[in-house]
Curated annotation (Swiss-Prot):
Top-level taxonomy: Eukaryota, Viridiplantae, Streptophyta, Embryophyta, Tracheophyta
InterPro entries: Amidohydro-rel, DHOdimr, Dihydroorotase_CS, Metal_Hydrolase
GO terms of biological process kind: 'de novo' UMP biosynthetic process; pyrimidine nucleobase biosynthetic process
EC number: 3.5.2.3
Family annotation (Gene3D superfamilies): Metal-dependent hydrolases (3.20.20.140)
Main location as per UniProt: mitochondrion
Entry binding sites for Zn(2+) 1: H44, H46, K130, D280
Species of provenance: Arabidopsis thaliana (Mouse-ear cress)
Record text on cofactor binding: Binds 2 Zn(2+) ions per subunit.
Official protein name in the record: Dihydroorotase, mitochondrial
Keyword vocabulary terms for this entry: Hydrolase, Metal-binding, Mitochondrion, Phosphoprotein, Pyrimidine biosynthesis, Transit peptide, Zinc
Length: 377
């Protein structure tokens, strides 16, 4: 629901606009826009552990009702028992008044057994299994080396249990250009996987290319979906190099050409049910980003809703925002939509330059920049 709130002005109403000829300025009224939507969920989130977990989880909990929590810790969350323990740590780190619900995932390995999928389904806290091709991204060294050769029985059990597979969609062959790895993954892994197991529910995570958009749109609704990050909607690969090397715009998959960004924006603002919010918010201490070997990951959780609202507002599609942020994700997972609401106000505000914590600093996406939308607290 979009509301336009008008502040009173005696010279405006049913009368015509009056011009002050001496200054040639129009006397007009102040307008404030508010947008109330069903409270969103984040279908791809990194919360880390230890001090970092305690620092960042309140940012996500302040705006999102639920989140699919990534399992790429050290060591990774490869079992249901480990997922239950990790969830307890998250719950302890939440503010006392929070109703945030972390939805856990398992880290798929070459050694994962079908029995683990049955345990995960029975647990009531594990909602998906994450596929990291070994070496594709942060803490993925324990990931899958041969999906069809070593994981097929597990994938077949996932079909039986209606357990979604969340896919980091990049090949890791060093001979393949980093900007082509998503496209090649679709051709060599994802398309054969869908053909072999058409009943497997798959989420292609953090899509970055028009190739991914076209693939998802070609699939049967409800069988393949995609999460989309704010950075891949707002930035292209020029943002990595403008004004010098920009480590806080570095993530995996890397930003792509402008034509790909435009294709993703068009897809998510079209009203398609196949695309939904997944920030891939990935906090790293500033010293680990601004270094000779900077970590991949963009921290967007504190400002994510403002960023998504910016995308939809600029596309003239604010009426499509709620479906993307709040409906498409739970519908795909077969979960109820949230009953709670959140209101966004169009009022300029400045993103903090940095978030300070006892252990160090975290620089958010769009640090120091002005955004137009913000959630009301």
């Amino acid at each position: 629901m979009i509301k336009t709130l008008v502040s009173p002005y005696s010279g405006f109403g049913s009368q015509k606009l009056k011009f002050d000829r001496s200054s040639e300025k129009v006397k007009t009224r102040a307008v404030r826009m508010e947008l109330t939507i069903t409270q969103p969920d984040d279908w791809h989130l990194h919360l880390r552990d230890g001090d970092l977990l305690h620092a960042v989880v309140p940012h996500s909990a302040s705006n999102f009702k639920r989140a699919i929590v990534m399992p790429n810790l050290k060591p990774p969350v490869t079992s249901t028992a480990a997922a239950i323990i990790y969830r307890k740590f998250i719950m302890k780190a939440l503010p006392s008044e929070s109703s945030f619900d972390p939805l856990m995932t398992l880290y798929l390995t070459d050694k994962t057994l079908p029995e683990e999928i049955r345990l995960a389904r029975e647990s009531g806290v594990v909602y998906a299994v994450k596929l990291y091709p070994a070496g594709a991204t942060t803490n993925s060294q324990d990931g899958v080396t041969d999906l069809f050769g070593k994981c097929l029985p597990v994938l077949e059990e996932m079909v039986k249990q209606n357990m979604p597979l969340l896919v980091h969609g990049e090949v890791t062959d060093p001979s393949i250009d980093v900007f082509d790895r998503e496209k090649i993954f679709i051709e060599t892994v994802l398309q054969p996987l869908i053909q072999r197991l058409p009943q497997l529910k798959v989420v292609m995570e953090h899509i970055t290319t028009m190739d991914a958009v076209n693939f998802v749109e070609s699939c049967k609704e409800g069988s393949v979906g995609a999460t989309v990050t704010p950075q891949h909607l707002l930035l292209n690969r020029n943002a990595l190099f403008q004004g010098g090397l920009q480590p806080h715009n570095y993530c995996l998959p890397v930003l792509k050409r402008e034509i790909h960004r435009e294709a993703i924006v068009k897809a998510v603002t079209s009203g398609s049910k196949k695309f939904f919010l997944g920030t891939d918010s990935a906090p790293h201490e500033r010293s680990r980003k601004e270094s000779s070997c900077g970590c991949a990951g963009i921290y967007s959780a504190p400002i994510a809703l403002s960023l998504y609202a910016k995308v939809f507002d600029e596309a003239g599609a604010l009426d499509k925002l709620e479906a993307f942020t709040s409906f498409n994700g739970p519908d795909f997972y077969g979960l109820p939509r949230n009953s709670s609401k959140i209101t966004l106000k169009k009022s300029p505000w400045k993103v903090p330059d940095v978030f300070n914590f006892p252990f160090g600093e975290i620089v958010p996406m769009f640090a120091g920049e002005t955004l137009q939308w913000q959630p009301l607290k």
